[in-house]
């Protein structure tokens, strides 16, 4: 749900959810991540061909990301029922709602441990505090996001690639503001 209809305009065929599963099967993707509705409707026809990462939380890109939070809309039990191979969770590091996010992630991680499911965390810096310390794509913010996801129990962490921006990097805490990358 983070990728709304506008994301499909460059490739109109991708508007069809089944296209994504067909492409993943034909190209032998290592996995396909999707929300519960797509997984329930399309995954049964591709089980065994395409490994599934069930995203258990998500948000639209309609509201600003200043107070980013992705509510859970599926469970680890749903993933087990569907035959998923892993759980996906988006964590917004630095958001004013980070405490809620971490509590929600704790429950998801406990359920992953209980069911033996690997946990993939999309760890993205967001919010005014992040903006004030170099921005969401600074090395500082990405490094922190990686570390937090690992410490929270992620088996795999998905991050944005840091972008070097000397003008913004000077706002990062030491020693990040002095690093030459």
What residue spans do the PLM features occupy?
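Alpha/beta enzyme core
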Residues: 2-181
